[in-house]
Amino acid sequence: MRVPKKERQRLLQETIEHNPFIKDEELSKQFSVSIQTIRLDRMELKIPEVRERIKHVASEHLDEVKSLSMSEVIGDMIDLKLDDSAISVLDIEKEHVFSRNEIARGHVLFAQANSLAVALINDELALTTKADIRFSRQVHLGERVVAKARVMKLRGDGRTDVTVESYVGEECVFDGDFTIYRRGEEEQA
Amino acid sequence: MRVPKKERQRLLQETIEHNPFIKDEELSKQFSVSIQTIRLDRMELKIPEVRERIKHVASEHLDEVKSLSMSEVIGDMIDLKLDDSAISVLDIEKEHVFSRNEIARGHVLFAQANSLAVALINDELALTTKADIRFSRQVHLGERVVAKARVMKLRGDGRTDVTVESYVGEECVFDGDFTIYRRGEEEQA
DNA sequence: AAAGAACTTAATACCTGGTACTAATAGCAG
DNA sequence: CTGCTATTAGTACCAGGTATTAAGTTCTTT
């Protein structure tokens, strides 16, 4: 039943992660050590007491409502030549990924690319009307995505074709062809 | 400062509902009564102590995470038949629109549709690999968007084609064809 | 085998945010 | 004034800890 300290602490961490509601007493039974040992372990691993853990879970729940405000999922613009080309950078953080596997959600990459394409247009009103997009590689928590947009064709009728390619390092992770409508008040973005 | 009992209890209930983390002590200050009075009030109203309230909020949260992260869908899922069809509703609010003209940003509609398409897939891992989308009408602040997703083709190779159409009332405002990858750990969403 | 270090357990005082219960007081109506 | 409700006070007790000091118990290393 009894496992060495290192192993016990690894298991402890896992156990608590998967059930934050468990008390020291239960843990001590589960690992067949004294309560004090569990507490030392928690200290070393910097795991807070059960009430704090519960509070943490609960408070995450509360912000969930406002979490996906989406308003600024767009990254930082680092270069912009209107009606020509633009570059933005987005660091993938916790709120951008599926909690289960830490892979960035599709609409995050889309949002970065779309926002960039729209920003590129030198006009008061610019709205996306159409987009063909491909996700070519997963993007993980902590990675930095650089999106590069270029105007391909400025049509006379108010439509502009913009291509966006997003990279993590050398690798292309996303690309899309956007048609942006400018000026008029029809169409959609 | 001091309000009659009935009124105080009504406010107490509201206060706690909107902030379940509040302690008796704070409440007693807020209502300028003693802690004991607050406790009598809670008794009468059958409101549990703060730790229980927090635990309750937290456990709701856990359920959600386990129940295949409905929370990760944007908008409210109102119907879901796995691997068949799904419907979600999203009310367009301030954070979804361009402040200049109160038109919903493209990636908001995309996010609703994309999330719905991904949620539809009856698998642990589901990631968008490709999407062709069209925005056919502007969506304005305050409008309610209903997205309807339907699985079109379940290919053998792990790819599934999903079509999503989003409506405001009778009008189609967005539609898209998504290719979702399931299972494996390649590709991207 | 003895010494030391690392690990484990024990014991005790104290903390927060309560419950449960008893009793005293305040404020007002009849 | 009596009676009633509402409020406040006080005490004992609880869970689930923290923090600290001290005492074993192993394991290793010389």
UniProtKB/Swiss-Prot annotation, chains A, B:
Official protein name in the record: Transcription factor FapR
Annotated function: Transcriptional factor involved in regulation of membrane lipid biosynthesis by repressing genes involved in fatty acid and phospholipid metabolism.
Coiled-coil residue windows: none
Keywords attached to this entry: DNA-binding, Fatty acid biosynthesis, Fatty acid metabolism, Lipid biosynthesis, Lipid metabolism, Repressor, Transcription, Transcription regulation
GO terms for MF: DNA binding; DNA-binding transcription factor activity
Family note: Belongs to the FapR family.
Single Gene Ontology BP annotation: negative regulation of DNA-templated transcription
Keyword 4Fe-4S attributed: no
A Pfam family this chain is assigned to: 4HBT
